[in-house]
Structures are given as C-alpha cells and as structure tokens.
Amino acid sequence: MEEEVQQHSHCVNCVSRRCMTRPEPGVSCDLIGCPLVCGAVFHSCKADEHRLLCPFERVPCLNSNFGCPFTLARNKVAEHLEMCPASVVCCTMEWNRWPVSYSDRKSYESLSRDADEVSQLDMALALQDQRMLLESLKVATMMSKATGKISKPREQISVNSSVQEVPRANGLVSADEESYGALYEATVETTRSLAAALDILNSATRDIGMLNTSLQGTTNEMDEESNRESSQDRNAKDQDHLDEGEIGAVGGIDYTGTSQNAQAEQNGSSDLLCNLNTSSYDTSALCNGFPLEKMCTQVKDQDQNFHGDSTESNITNGDCVEADGTSEPPSSLLVAEQLKEGSALPDSTYQHILMPDEDDDEDLCWKKDLGDSKDVNGSPLSHATSFKFLSNSWYIPKEDKAVDTSDLEVAEDPMGLQGIDLITAALLFCLGDSPGGRGISDSRMVDVYHVDFGTQTFSLPSAILATNTMVGEIASASACDHANPQLSNPSPFQTLGLDLVLECVARYQPKQRSMFTFVCGQLFRRKEFSSHFKNVHGDIHAGLNGWMEQRCPLAYYGCTYSQRRFCPSTQGAKIIHDRHLRSFGVQPCVSTALEEPSRNCVLGLRSDHLSSLPFEVLQHIAGFLDGFSLCQLACVSRLMRDICGSLLQSRGMVILQWGKKKYPEGNSSWQIKEKVWRFSTAFCSVNDWKFADILSMADHLKKCSYNVIEKREEAIPLPCMCVTRELTKEGRSLRSVLKPVL
C-alpha cells in the first residue's frame, strides 16, 4: 500500500468522479467504474480498497465461524442474519414444580395410569420434566457426597441436665437405642413419600436454629453467673477460658512439658490442685466459666474401651498431675471423671453434668454422657487420659480412602425403600443431597479433634438415582438433543412424582430448596424465537392450570377426564405434545376424505402415492412445513429424510459441538469437534385462539363415575341436644334446644 501511495501521489487525495488529470507513471492512473456496477468511479489503483466497501461484493456471513455456509452480497448480510442457520437463540424460560405430597400420591397414580393413551398437555409436560430430571441424575448404588469443605465444630456443651432431647431427623446415627428407635420410625414413615422429604428438610433447619438459640442463651446465663463469683475465685480472672465451640468432648490430647510449665507459671504455682467444696458450688465451675487451675484429672488408661455395657468409674482420691509429669500425694480434692453411656443430645452433642459423688459428700465428680459412637474407620471412640485442652493442632491428619458405613451394622433396608417406587426414591434422595439434607458423613469435634462420622447406613437399590447438584440447580433441557440420558437401565417412569401445577418464581426471589426448577433450553433460529415464546410459554404454559386443559373437578379423587377448551383459530387444528421431540406442536385438521382410501387399501398394494412424486415436487411441498412437522416427516422413510436433509441449510440450524484436544506437551484446548445440522421444534405461529366446540363439563359430571351423590336422610343431633330441652307440639325446635345453652 505504501508503494502505491508513493507511485500515485495524486490518487491518494483524489475523490472526484470527473478527474481530468492525465495518467502519469508514479503520479496518477485512469478512472474506472465498479466491476459489480455499484455506481462507484475511482482510480484503478484503489480497486482493492473498493472491494472492502462495495455493497455488491460477496462476503461470507458474519456467523461463518459458527457454521453458517452462506456467502452473500454485503448489502444482504443484515437481512440474512434474521434467518441465518447459525444465529441460534436458546430459550431460558424457567418454571418450577413442587414434589407430590403424600396425601396426593394416590390421585396422581391414577392420573398417570392412562397417560400414554390420553393426550393431556399438562400431564405430558409434567412427565417430560420428570424424565428430564431423572436423566440428569447419575446412577449410583451408594449415595455419596464428596465435599472438601471443613465443617464447623458441632460439639456443644450444656450445663443444664434438663435439656430436652429432641431426636434430629437429619440422618444422623444415634447410639442411644431409644432415640435411635424414634429416629428410625420417623425415617421409615417419612421416606415413603416425597412430602416426607420436605418435612425432613424443614425440621432439620428448624431444629438447628432452636438448638443454637438455646445454647446461646445458656452461654449468656453462665457469663452472668461468672461475673458474680465469690471472692475465693477472683484470683482466676486472668486465666484463659476455653470457648464453648473449641472444648469438644472432655479429655483432649496430652500436654507437652512446655505447655504444662507455662500454665503452672501463669497460675503462680507448680501444681494444678483445686479446692472445691459443695458449699461454694455454682455454675461458674462449669463449662465456659471454670478456670483451668481448678481442674485436676486422673490419668486413665488410653486403651480403656467404653462401648458395650455402661460403666462408672468414681475416683475420689486420684493423683494430680504436676507440671513435670510426676504425681503428688492426694493432699487436696481431685475432680474425678465418671463415664456413663447415655442418650445423646440433638446433633450428637455431649452433655456434661457436675454432680456430688456418692462416696464423699465433699467431693465433686465430673459426669460425662458419651454415646457409643463409631468413626468411619470402625474403631470405637477412645477417651483421652485426662482433661488437657491446650493444643495447636485441632485436626487429625487425614488421608484419602474409600470407606463405607457398613460397619455400623444397621439392618438392610432400614428406611423401607423397597416399599416406594423408583421415582419417589429418586426425588427423595435428590432432596436429601440439597442443603440441609442427608450426607454420607458429618464432621464433628471429639477430643479436640475433627472426626468424620458416618451418617448413611443403607445401601440403595441399583436403580436409585443420586445427584451431585443442589435441587435449585437441576435444569431440564427440553430440546431433543440437549439431554444426554445417563441411565444405564432406562425405564418409562410413568408414575408422576411432580405436581401438575406450574409455579412461576422470579429469578430475584428466593426459592424453596425443595422446589424443582426446570429450564426450557430449546434452540431456535432467531426469527422463530418470538413466536415460540409467545405461543408456548405465554399461551400454552399459562393455560395448563385450568384454562387450556380443563380437568374434571373430581380429578383429586382419581377422575382422569379432561377437555381442551382452547384451540388455534385454524378450523380443526389442535395442540399436541410429542414425547420424543419434547415439544408442543400444532396438528392441522385432516379431512376424512383423505383417510378413507387408506382404510380400503389391500395389503401388498402400493398405497404410498406421495413417495412416487418427483424429488423436486416433494422438496417444494416440504418447504411449506414448519420445523416441528419436518422433524416428524424425517422419521417416515429414507426418501423423506433425504428430502428434509436438502432443506437443512434453508430451514434448519447448525449447532457447534466442542471437544477437548490434548497436545503432546500436556496442555489442552477446546476446539470445534463437529457441526450438527437439525431442525428446530418451532411450529407455525398461532395468532388467535378460540373456544373449542366441546360439551360442557357439567355434562361429564352427570355420568362421571366418581360423582357419587351421598344422600343423608338420617337426622344428626346437634352437640347441644344432649342437655335438657323443651318440647313443643311440632317437636323439637332449634330455638328451644338452644335456649338452655344461651
């Protein structure tokens, strides 16, 4: 370009169509017109520049990198973009459904019984959403949840022995037989319906809030009592107090010699003896409020086993541990430790109670209720040797290994899963994996360590489904090629487990965790999207709750009758739903004259007169069909498939499929794997709707088998008729009956 400018210094600034300058080498050149006859006149040296601006120059489509094969004039690009096969729009319309409650299960089973024979739009859409929901889940024989997050310590200490022990219905395994039995019965009852899953989630969330509120109130009371301590305990104000969430179970890891010496120097004494008596006993010596120098413990054997029968160990004259590790004579009162197997508090917290010893009235023993819990490795929880809390390491070194909870020895199928259908079980465990649901393990704090406890003890059937996503994040792609079924053994799943009623919740509004959200996800050409959104979501979806598809008022009792109240303005056309395309469509009216010859055809004779037409004629006829009809026509025969394939560039759309390519160096990148051509599921636009010519619903109620009239001819006395009443000539009057009451 620079050479041209140097050679033609005149042409650089010349824009006149009537330039009279004579051509001179290196100065100017001749004037020429546009070869494509766009009307432009310019110097011949500017021909390449004009091609960049000429409106008649043929250029590839702007979406050529996305698969559009068309090359067209520059002035036709804007018009082409409206029908460009690569200009694809994805519909992001969302709707929500509630799971079917337990009380409605029977009625929904009867409604789903004849779903294939009776074409009901609301039932077809609900079953489609259910299939897409189940296909989006993963098949698993054991429900697993791989979470890398660190759970907060859930060990809490209570100072009141009268805390109400409410069994938590969150899937935790309790060691107490009574509480576990109640939890087992509640779990068996709740898992038989999807509504029970909602109760599990709600009750779990509510119990957590109530427990936290109770513990916070208890902590405040202890702080107030600690401020009113007697003068005997005022020297302990500068001591370090342990936080309630950090104490965990009684008995932590052993002190090192350095930590013991530092603690002894801080107390001003080399021993850790305490002087307690029953007269000065108050809540300040408990939990959050007690000073460390008042606590003396007896060294216990670390190999002591606490599971099995409950045992008590009352030691009133044990030796105190000094800073140097030696023992002193029993010159003062020691705090003994009494371990007893008892019922666990909600959330598996440990309850510590300070109570007098039976052997010595002046002694106080520390009683601890520890459930027979087991960690995921199967070993029983071993109690530490003494009350030693200070530590810089709060976590046990972890390692990755495949474990299960079979060592908990819970009976097979404890939740009664064999009594419910696969759909209810799949949706139940889908809810269980949501926030507040059941996990396979739970991290708790025991002996100042975080230990993972098993919480799921049942093996799921091979067809039970589990998911790694939250409930609110599960999306249903309604397009034909969008959802890739992941079921190894697919089944029809005809029993409806989702509510027929669609719930619309704005995106900025919070949704219930037990509500399933579905996304349309269909792909359309840009010019087809407006009609799809108006007809499908604005007209059909909005009318499924009683306007377009009107059900019998007795449908709750099992009546499956329904009628289509609205239909397109075209005479005889009706709305249908195709299960394979997962989309709605318009079926035009078929004349009875066209159906008669097919009934009289003799087997063996050629009755397909349409296929005998020339290819060009068939191609012209197919050009008048919409995308929904072309998808149906392509499944008729190979000839019709070839005809529809010839219309893909003009009527179809192209979708890019990406694949991950790995290089020898080790890095990878995403590249276009292939370009897929297909038709959209859009149908011809319906501008007007009209009422269908059908009978009234009252005519159906006259012969509805569920409309049983119950005549009550026997008089039913009022509650107040049991008292003394006056009699009149006509008999018992209501006024006389009510008079004594008034």
UniProtKB/Swiss-Prot annotation:
Segments crossing the lipid bilayer: none
Coiled-coil boundaries: none
Description of post-translational modifications: Auto-ubiquitinated. May be neddylated. Neddylation may be required for E3 ligase activity.
Disulfide feature: none
Keyword Zinc-finger: yes
Pathway terms, separated by semicolons: Protein modification; protein ubiquitination
Biased composition (Basic and acidic residues): 225-242
Domain F-box: 607-653
Zinc finger (TRAF-type): 49-108
UniProt xrefs under InterPro entries: F-box-like_dom_sf, F-box_dom, Fbxo30/Fbxo40, Znf_RING/FYVE/PHD, Znf_TRAF, Znf_TRAF_N
GO MF term set: ubiquitin protein ligase activity; zinc ion binding
Disordered: annotated span: 214-242
Keywords of the record: Metal-binding, Phosphoprotein, Ubl conjugation, Ubl conjugation pathway, Zinc, Zinc-finger
Any one of the GO BP annotations: chromosome condensation
Modified residue annotations for Phosphoserine: 379
Domain of life: Eukaryota
Assembly notes: Part of a SCF (SKP1-cullin-F-box) protein ligase complex. Interacts with SKP1, CUL1 and RBX1/ROC1.
Record function comment: Substrate-recognition component of the SCF (SKP1-CUL1-F-box protein)-type E3 ubiquitin ligase complex. Required for muscle atrophy following denervation.
Record protein name field: F-box only protein 30
